[in-house]
């Protein structure tokens, strides 16, 4: 029982509820664009290199609030997106409830195809869904795709290549058989947040 097409009942808790809960009252004013990092030291680098300012309140997501920073001259904010699909979606829904409209996710994937080299930056053209969180949002979904305009801009600006990946939440269930099925679909790597 995942996404029920005829279920129009209210959610028990929403990101908006979390933001304005009895535990806290959030007054964050965020820019329209946020960058989420799903890897360790990326936020530390931006803080040191771009004179980022930590906002006075943490991002009040349900699964562990976290600091959020702003780089004023770029009209964007950034934060750690968490680990795994549930925390990624929690972060995205919280940002959306706070008025953020554009979210760019930056993370790492484990490549299992030699066409991708260690340290290479790629832009996923498709992310095949192998995790459970997406199934709470879509009745039937095989893969997700990024915004086409953003995909083109990032690819041309950074001079990177596009490949398909797989997003999973079962680290220890990546079998050689599954890997071959993913390769047959054109995927070159696997992550946990896309």
PLM region descriptions:
Residues 1-104, 110-194:
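Accessory terminal and edge-of-domain segments that mediate assembly/interaction
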């Amino acid at each position: 029982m995942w996404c029920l097409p005829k279920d129009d009942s209210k959610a028990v808790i929403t990101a908006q509820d979390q933001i304005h809960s009895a535990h806290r009252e959030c007054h964050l004013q965020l820019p329209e664009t946020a960058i989420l990092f799903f890897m360790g030291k990326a936020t530390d680098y931006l803080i040191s290199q771009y004179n980022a300012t930590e906002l006075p309140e943490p991002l009040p997501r349900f699964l562990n609030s976290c600091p959020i920073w702003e780089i004023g001259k770029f009209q964007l904010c950034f934060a750690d997106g968490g680990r795994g699909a549930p925390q990624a979606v929690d972060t995205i829904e919280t940002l959306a409830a706070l008025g953020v409209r554009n979210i760019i996710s930056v993370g790492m994937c484990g490549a299992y195809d030699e066409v991708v080299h260690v340290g290479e930056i790629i832009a996923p053209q498709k992310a095949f869904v192998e995790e459970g969180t997406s199934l709470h949002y879509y009745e039937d979904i095989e893969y997700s795709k990024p915004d086409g305009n953003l995909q083109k801009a990032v690819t041309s600006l950074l001079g990177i290549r596009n490949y398909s990946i797989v997003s999973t939440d079962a680290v220890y269930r990546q079998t050689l058989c599954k890997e071959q099925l993913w390769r047959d679909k054109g995927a070159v790597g696997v992550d946990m947040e896309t």
